[in-house]
Amino acid sequence: MRGFIIGRFQPFHKGHLEVIKKIAEEVDEIIIGIGSAQKSHTLENPFTAGERILMITQSLKDYDLTYYPIPIKDIEFNSIWVSYVESLTPPFDIVYSGNPLVRVLFEERGYEVKRPEMFNRKEYSGTEIRRRMLNGEKWEHLVPKAVVDVIKEIKGVERLRKLAQTDK
C-alpha cells in the first residue's frame, strides 16, 4: 500500500520525521509531496524545493523506508487540485493530512484520509524554527542533524536574516 503526505517542510523537522516514521508502520511506500514547490527566498518559505528534498533525503537515509519526494507547485485551483497532484505522483491508496482543506479535497475524491498524530506541535513547527533562526535562538535540536548540515551548507540562517532586513 502507498500513502501520500504533503507539507511545505520549511524546514523539515523532527515532528515531520516522527509523522513519516509512524506512517511507514502502516504503508509500504510513502509519497512525500513538497508543497509550494515554486516558493523560496521569503520569510515564510526560505528554502527551495531542491533544498527541501535534500533535507528530507538526508534525514531519511538511515531508515528502511521506500519514499518518493515529489515537488508540487501551488495552482490556486482547489476543485482540480487532487487531479493535479495525481498527475505528478505515483498512484496512492491513502492520504495523511491534518489540513482541513487537503482532507476535504481528497475525501471528496473518494480517498481514505487519516489525520497523522502531531508531535510537540508547539516546538516542532517551521514557523517556530524560522523565528528562532531569525532571533539567534537555539533551533538545531528541533531538526534532524542532517537538516542542520544542509542549512549550514546553503547558509540558510544567513539567507533568512538577509530576507528579514528592510531597506530603511
From Swiss-Prot:
<dbReference type="InterPro" id="IPR004821">
    <property type="entry name" value="Cyt_trans-like"/>
</dbReference>
<protein>
    <recommendedName>
        <fullName>Nicotinamide-nucleotide adenylyltransferase</fullName>
        <ecNumber>2.7.7.1</ecNumber>
    </recommendedName>
</protein>
<dbReference type="InterPro" id="IPR006418">
    <property type="entry name" value="NMN_Atrans_arc"/>
</dbReference>
<feature type="binding site">
    <location>
        <position position="119"/>
    </location>
    <ligand>
        <name>ATP</name>
    </ligand>
</feature>
<feature type="binding site">
    <location>
        <position position="13"/>
    </location>
    <ligand>
        <name>ATP</name>
    </ligand>
</feature>
<feature type="binding site">
    <location>
        <position position="124"/>
    </location>
    <ligand>
        <name>ATP</name>
    </ligand>
</feature>
<feature type="binding site">
    <location>
        <position position="130"/>
    </location>
    <ligand>
        <name>ATP</name>
    </ligand>
</feature>
<feature type="binding site">
    <location>
        <position position="9"/>
    </location>
    <ligand>
        <name>ATP</name>
    </ligand>
</feature>
<feature type="binding site">
    <location>
        <position position="127"/>
    </location>
    <ligand>
        <name>ATP</name>
    </ligand>
</feature>
<keyword id="KW-0963">Cytoplasm</keyword>
<keyword id="KW-0067">ATP-binding</keyword>
<keyword id="KW-0547">Nucleotide-binding</keyword>
<dbReference type="InterPro" id="IPR014729">
    <property type="entry name" value="Rossmann-like_a/b/a_fold"/>
</dbReference>
<dbReference type="GO" id="GO:0005524">
    <property type="term" value="F:ATP binding"/>
</dbReference>
<feature type="binding site">
    <location>
        <position position="126"/>
    </location>
    <ligand>
        <name>ATP</name>
    </ligand>
</feature>
<keyword id="KW-0662">Pyridine nucleotide biosynthesis</keyword>
<dbReference type="GO" id="GO:0000309">
    <property type="term" value="F:nicotinamide-nucleotide adenylyltransferase activity"/>
</dbReference>
<comment type="function">
    <text>Catalyzes the formation of NAD(+) from nicotinamide mononucleotide (NMN) and ATP.</text>
</comment>
<comment type="subunit">
    <text>Homohexamer existing as a trimer of dimers.</text>
</comment>
<comment type="similarity">
    <text>Belongs to the archaeal NMN adenylyltransferase family.</text>
</comment>
<dbReference type="Pfam" id="PF01467">
    <property type="entry name" value="CTP_transf_like"/>
</dbReference>
<feature type="binding site">
    <location>
        <position position="16"/>
    </location>
    <ligand>
        <name>ATP</name>
    </ligand>
</feature>
<feature type="binding site">
    <location>
        <position position="121"/>
    </location>
    <ligand>
        <name>ATP</name>
    </ligand>
</feature>
<comment type="pathway">
    <text>Cofactor biosynthesis; NAD(+) biosynthesis; NAD(+) from nicotinamide D-ribonucleotide: step 1/1.</text>
</comment>
<dbReference type="GO" id="GO:0009435">
    <property type="term" value="P:NAD biosynthetic process"/>
</dbReference>
<feature type="binding site">
    <location>
        <position position="8"/>
    </location>
    <ligand>
        <name>ATP</name>
    </ligand>
</feature>
<keyword id="KW-0520">NAD</keyword>
<keyword id="KW-0808">Transferase</keyword>
<keyword id="KW-0548">Nucleotidyltransferase</keyword>
<dbReference type="GO" id="GO:0005737">
    <property type="term" value="C:cytoplasm"/>
</dbReference>
